[in-house]
């Protein structure tokens, strides 16, 4: 990330046309330089020597303090132009001596006895005289205002993630009647999102506002592994929820998943997450950056820069692994979620309810509103997943495959990557809101867990589940009886009985929709 700040020390841009070459002016400058040396000071002492020059001397140099300052501010984004401004300010005689010295001597970059003017270019400190291109970066990568925006933004999603997912876990584990297949998937989603909040958000924020890796090699591997596993488990759980909802709505007559099967699927999710992220943990190492040092304070105290990064044998292997992660953690889950929710939406749209009778008309309007609400919810779920993770994966693919300029990479790493991470982690903050608090059963479980009373007393959840189970049995029995009578009377009454058989099946579909709406299956 910080490898795009520096430029080779040999690429200095000299501008001598602004300095007068008249013999009297050269002699005058040499006399001033000699008088300064006789007083015990250096031939050039930066801004102090500039202040000692008379106004006439500054006019003869063709520069004034204001002109030089404005020239510096206009060109501070280009290192070459910044050094050009420095060479303008150096007296000609002293500049010539230093040019000869640079050609004949090698300066020690860590020696305090040598003369090392340091200039701030994009918050980066450069040693102008150095045979080794060492770039000095500030410990904090951003101004305090920008860092405050990052901290507040990350703290907001961290707070929502921790509070929301903790409440979801508490509700599901506290109420035994909520131990259903879908709720177990939601519980697993909340656990993985909690891991994202604990291990991903603080470390990513720290990495985005300071230079280097402040922890050791063990923490580098553990944090990288846990971050990858938690993100992968969260995405895989979203796919499991989509498949479970798809089976309940599109194929309501097929056997549903059992609690035991749900536990097996959850174990498979975590095993897959560990397997796909293990190569990253193996390749993660803390490495010292040879050409960069961190400037810790205003007294020019510095320290080495360490990075926690993947050390692949070659760039092609890194590209292959990035592509595998992109396909398995974003592209394939996204395709499955869109396909499953698309099929659910089509099934809801095609579901028919009898239109005859005033009661049926009212039922139709109620069902129509429920269908619209459910379809909107499915669209929101799919769009949030797409928009949350697309920027981060796009940046990761661009970093590995696109031929970006150093300036583009610098902007991406310092400003765009923090926003992309924030957007991706925000998905873990909104998941408990979408999958938990938007359904009636979780609100009821929240009320029971914290013993809250509403104005209207509601039936106990166990009784509600029992009534739903009885209604399912009655609907299935009536459906089978009607189908049997249809086969026994294949002539004139077939159409009548076929219409009769259609109603229980549609009622069953709408009952499934109602149940999934209330128990997070839609």
UniProtKB/Swiss-Prot annotation:
It is a multi-pass membrane protein. Disulfide bonds join 220-308. Keywords: Cell membrane, Disulfide bond, G-protein coupled receptor, Glycoprotein, Membrane, Receptor, Transducer, Transmembrane, Transmembrane helix. Its main location: membrane. Residues 169-184, 243-262, 341-377, 435-522 are cytoplasmic. The keyword Zinc-finger does not apply. One of its GO terms (biological process) is neuropeptide signaling pathway. It is found in: Cell membrane. Belongs to the G-protein coupled receptor 1 family. Receptor for NPAF (A-18-F-amide) and NPFF (F-8-F-amide) neuropeptides, also known as morphine-modulating peptides. Can also be activated by a variety of naturally occurring or synthetic FMRF-amide like ligands. This receptor mediates its action by association with G proteins that activate a phosphatidylinositol-calcium second messenger system. This is Neuropeptide FF receptor 2.
């Amino acid at each position: 990330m910080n490898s795009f700040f520096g430029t080779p020390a040999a690429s200095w841009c000299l501008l001598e046309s602004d300095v007068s070459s008249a013999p009297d002016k050269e002699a005058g400058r040499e006399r001033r330089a000699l008088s300064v040396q006789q007083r015990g000071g250096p031939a050039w002492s930066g801004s102090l020597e500039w202040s000692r020059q008379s106004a006439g001397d500054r006019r003869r140099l063709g520069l004034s303090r204001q002109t030089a300052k404005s020239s510096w501010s206009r060109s501070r984004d280009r290192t070459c132009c910044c050094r050009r401004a420095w060479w303008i300010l150096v007296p000609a005689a002293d500049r010539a001596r230093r040019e000869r010295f640079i050609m004949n001597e090698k300066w020690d970059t860590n020696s305090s006895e040598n003369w090392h003017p340091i200039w701030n270019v994009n918050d980066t400190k450069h040693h102008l005289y150095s045979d080794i291109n060492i770039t000095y970066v500030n410990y904090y990568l951003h101004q305090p205002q920008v860092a405050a925006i990052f901290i507040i933004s990350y703290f907001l999603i961290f707070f929502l993630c921790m509070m929301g997912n903790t409440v979801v876990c508490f509700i599901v584990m506290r109420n035994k009647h909520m131990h259903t297949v879908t709720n177990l998937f939601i519980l697993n989603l909340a656990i993985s999102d909690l891991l994202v909040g604990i291990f991903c958000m603080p470390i990513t924020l720290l990495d985005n506002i300071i230079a280097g890796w402040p922890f050791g090699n063990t923490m580098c591997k553990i944090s990288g592994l846990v971050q990858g596993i938690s993100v992968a488990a969260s995405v895989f759980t979203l796919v499991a929820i989509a498949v479970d909802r798809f089976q309940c709505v599109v194929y309501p007559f097929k056997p549903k998943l059992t609690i035991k099967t749900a536990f097996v699927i959850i174990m498979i999710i975590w095993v897959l997450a560990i397997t796909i992220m293990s190569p990253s943990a193996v390749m993660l190492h803390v490495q010292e950056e040879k050409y960069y040092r961190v400037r810790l304070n205003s007294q020019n105290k510095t320290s080495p820069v360490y990075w926690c990064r993947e050390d692949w044998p070659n760039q092609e292997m890194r590209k292959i692994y990035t592509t595998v992660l992109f396909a398995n953690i974003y592209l394939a889950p996204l395709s499955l979620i869109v396909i499953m929710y698309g099929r659910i939406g089509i099934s809801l749209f095609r579901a028919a309810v009898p239109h005859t009778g005033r009661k049926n008309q009212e039922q139709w309007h109620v069902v129509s509103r429920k269908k619209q609400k459910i379809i909107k919810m499915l669209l929101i779920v799919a769009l949030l997943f797409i928009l949350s993770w697309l920027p981060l994966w796009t940046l990761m693919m661009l970093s590995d495959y696109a031929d970006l300029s150093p300036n583009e990479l610098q902007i991406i790493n310092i400003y765009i990557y923090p926003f992309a991470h924030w957007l991706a982690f925000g998905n873990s903050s909104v998941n408990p809101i979408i999958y938990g608090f938007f359904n009636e059963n979780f609100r009821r479980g929240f009320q029971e867990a914290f013993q809250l009373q509403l104005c209207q007393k509601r039936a106990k959840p166990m009784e509600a589940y029992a009534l739903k189970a009885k209604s399912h049995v009655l609907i299935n029995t009536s459906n089978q009886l009607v189908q049997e009578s249809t086969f026994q009377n294949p002539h004139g009454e077939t159409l009548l009985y076929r219409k009769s058989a259609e109603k229980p099946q549609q009622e069953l579909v709408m009952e499934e929709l109602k149940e999934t709406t209330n128990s997070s299956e839609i």
